[in-house]
């Protein structure tokens, strides 16, 4: 499978179908997990900036060994564990300015579909039952590891460390589980092979194809999912449908601490829940955007502080009065340059460079309402939006002043006040009942 940059050609003109692997909901997400969520939210936002209609699906894995183990530790049900950490996830990513997905499917909602999917693979000869488990025949899948650029020999070597009991149930050590027989005391569902639950990989294949169809435009996730998760998704999905599963694969880089990957297994992680106690959500999000999504980023106190300083500069730029005239061609040149930067594999680092160039241009005296909204639109691609520090009582006072000016036929002053409020994102509506106002953007 090519790792070269390719022009994006959607399945359907003007529309994008994206599936991004979401969290296994057994704990709070850490900063590394958040990078993936933010990266793909930014990619989605950029497609929308370019006027695409985006169907964005990101799942919750709510059936997993880790959830079962956490339920035992906390003395609650796996369902209660999943509900608890889904709520925590939503709270954390909202603080990071992440938009809700078009749909957040949960595995438990698709159990019948998963069973039918596995049955179909068995009928086609791609899967087999063994002692209540069902496994996928890797040898039958042509170009099985094309995504990860691995050979079957590599996989067989990697499988050598598995237990004899596990290997004994398989035709080949590299075969992977589609369905797992239930263990005593574990949550399970009835199936043609006895009570059990789905394997990890089958879940995303089923949710993606059921919601978005057999072939999607983009499938994304963290770099650690390339193998085996995404590799296995491709194998089982294409075996079932006979079609390409995803036309484009995108993987975000890791967040490192002291140049070592942040992970729960290494114990060097910081949860978003804790990070937000000392770091503003927009600052953390802006920090992520300073590096290309596919490259590692080092999480340091200095890097976060620099992000905070730079974000403050952009906020100060945005909050000045945007009155005056500008050269429309110069404004268009910045917009074109921004698109060129982001079109190159969603290069947020280069996109932000253009935003700062535009900020310096604005601060040199080039500002009006059109510039303000163009600037705000670029920032919103990165999920950066600012609160307008305009108090309701101040707006009302200006409206009263404008009404007096109109009554005195001082239309120049009335127009000036209208323009002043528009630069602050406030639109005036003159009605028979009087003047009302509304915000042009809800900035947060």
Task: Describe the residue ranges of each PLM region.
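Short phosphate-binding/catalytic loops that engage adenosine nucleotides
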Residues: 52, 126, 426
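N-terminal, positively charged, Ser/Thr/Ala/Gly-biased leader segments
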Residues: 91-127
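Short, polar/flexible loop-turn hinges at active-site or ligand-entry regions and domain interfaces
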Residues: 74-80, 101, 294-298
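N-terminal, positively charged nucleic-acid-binding surface of large information/translation enzymes
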Residues: 2-7, 11-97, 433, 437
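Structural preference for alpha-helix termini/caps and helix-kink/transition segments
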Residues: 261-444
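Alpha-helical recognition segments enriched in aromatics with Gly/Pro capping
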Residues: 1-24, 41, 112-320
């Amino acid at each position: 499978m090519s790792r070269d940059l390719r022009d994006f050609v959607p399945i359907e003109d003007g529309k994008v179908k994206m599936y991004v692997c979401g969290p296994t909901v057994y704990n709070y997400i850490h900063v590394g997990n958040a990078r993936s969520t933010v990266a793909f939210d930014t990619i989605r936002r950029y497609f929308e900036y370019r006027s695409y209609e985006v169907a964005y699906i990101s799942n919750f894995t709510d059936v997993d060994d880790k959830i079962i183990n956490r339920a035992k530790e906390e003395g609650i049900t796996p369902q209660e564990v999943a509900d608890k950490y889904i709520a925590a996830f939503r709270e954390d990513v909202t603080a990071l300015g992440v938009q809700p997905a078009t749909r957040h499917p949960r595995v438990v909602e698709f159990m019948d579909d998963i069973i039918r999917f596995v049955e179909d693979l068995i009928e086609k000869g791609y899967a087999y039952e063994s002692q209540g488990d069902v496994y996928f025949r890797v040898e039958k899948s042509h170009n099985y590891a094309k995504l990860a650029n691995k050979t079957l020999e590599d996989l067989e070597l990697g499988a050598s460390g598995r237990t004899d009991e596990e290997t004994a149930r398989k035709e080949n050590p590299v075969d992977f589980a589609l369905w797992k027989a239930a263990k005593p005391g574990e949550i399970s569902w009835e199936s043609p092979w006895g009570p059990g639950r789905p394997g990890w990989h089958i879940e995303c294949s089923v949710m993606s194809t059921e919601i978005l169809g057999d072939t999607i435009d983009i499938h994304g996730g963290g770099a650690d999912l390339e193998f085996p998760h995404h590799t296995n998704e491709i194998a089982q999905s294409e075996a079932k449908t006979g079609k390409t599963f995803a036309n484009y694969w995108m993987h975000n880089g890791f967040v490192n601490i002291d140049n070592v990957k942040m992970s729960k297994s290494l114990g060097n992680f910081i949860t978003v829940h804790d990070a937000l106690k000392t770091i503003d959500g927009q600052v953390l999000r802006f920090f992520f955007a300073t590096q290309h999504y596919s490259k590692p980023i080092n999480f340091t106190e200095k890097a976060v502080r620099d992000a905070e300083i730079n974000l403050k500069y952009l906020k100060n730029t945005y909050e000045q009065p945007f009155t005056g005239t500008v050269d429309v061609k110069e404004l268009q040149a910045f917009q074109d340059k921004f698109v060129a930067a982001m079109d190159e594999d969603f290069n947020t680092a280069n996109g932000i460079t253009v935003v700062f160039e535009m900020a310096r241009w604005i601060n040199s005296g080039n500002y009006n309402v059109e510039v303000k909204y163009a600037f705000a639109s670029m920032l919103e691609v990165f999920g950066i939006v600012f609160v307008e520090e305009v108090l309701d009582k101040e707006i009302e006072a200006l409206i009263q002043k404008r009404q007096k000016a109109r009554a005195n036929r001082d239309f120049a002053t009335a127009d000036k006040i209208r323009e002043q409020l528009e630069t602050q994102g406030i639109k005036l509506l003159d009605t028979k009942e009087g003047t009302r106002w509304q915000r042009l953007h809800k900035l947060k």
